[in-house]
From Swiss-Prot:
Binding site for GTP: 30-37, 57-61, 75-78, 142-145, 172-174
Origin superkingdom: Bacteria
Gene Ontology CC annotations of this record: cytosol
Organism: Chlorobaculum tepidum (strain ATCC 49652 / DSM 12025 / NBRC 103806 / TLS)
GO biological process, alphabetically ordered: division septum assembly
Cofactor: Mg(2+)
Assigned keywords, A-Z: Cell cycle, Cell division, GTP-binding, Magnesium, Metal-binding, Nucleotide-binding, Septation
Pfam family, one: MMR_HSR1
Protein name: Probable GTP-binding protein EngB
UniProt binding sites for Mg(2+): S37, T59
Keyword Metal-binding part of the UniProt annotation: yes
This protein's encoding gene: engB
Membership in a protein family: Belongs to the TRAFAC class TrmE-Era-EngA-EngB-Septin-like GTPase superfamily. EngB GTPase family.
Record domain EngB-type G: where: 22-192
Length: 192
């Protein structure tokens, strides 16, 4: 897959009014501060396409980006952020689960996992939920450049044992772009 155009499309605070034009949706989900926005910017080679922040929980909406005018990348709010109120956390949870359960246009879910913390309970719960919903998913180990070689081997083994149903596992560095081509090729197989 070659990304020639990537533009912000729209943000949604509810499941009402989501695009109904039949374009496939590649969904990016993960814990708060896992690097979803940085990965999207790197993947699309567009700095600033998705707003990044060092503050967890910044993405609070469903953000749509139109790619090559024929598909959407969808950035979902992160899960697992403890510093928001219970009501807001529940609201995000309902938005996220409702979208994943009901959205017919989802072609693939890309689950981002911090390579420094593979196998966290919330990530394992998301994998189970995706399996329960029958959603094909792949895993991207983010922040790969922050690990030493021994840590990389351990992270890979851990995630492989935790995610037997993942269609692919890609090690990714948003800083260097390492893993970009492999991730794009993996996504491409679900948009044909």
């Amino acid at each position: 897959m070659n990304i020639t155009t990537a533009d912000f499309f729209c943000s949604y605070s509810s499941l009402n009014g989501l695009p109904s034009d039949g374009r496939p949706e590649i969904v990016f989900v993960g814990r708060s501060n896992v690097g979803k926005s940085s990965l999207l910017n790197s993947l699309c080679a567009r700095k600033g396409l998705a707003k990044t922040s060092s503050t967890p929980g910044k993405t609070r909406l469903i953000n749509y980006f139109i790619i090559n005018d024929n598909l959407y990348f969808v950035d979902l709010p992160g899960y697992g952020y403890a510093k928001v109120g219970q009501g807001e956390r529940e609201s995000w949870g309902k938005l996220l689960t409702g979208y994943i359960q009901k959205r017919g246009e989802i072609a693939l879910v890309v689950l981002l996992v911090d390579s420094r913390h593979p196998g966290m309970a919330s990530d394992l719960e998301m994998m189970e939920f995706l399996d329960y919903c029958g959603r094909p998913f792949g895993i991207v180990l983010t922040k790969w450049d922050k690990l030493k070689q021994a840590e990389k081997s351990k992270a890979s083994r851990t995630i492989e044992s935790c995610a037997p149903n993942a269609r692919f596992i890609v090690n990714y560095s948003s800083l260097s772009g390492s893993g970009r081509d492999r991730l794009l090729a993996s996504i491409d197989t679900f948009t044909q």
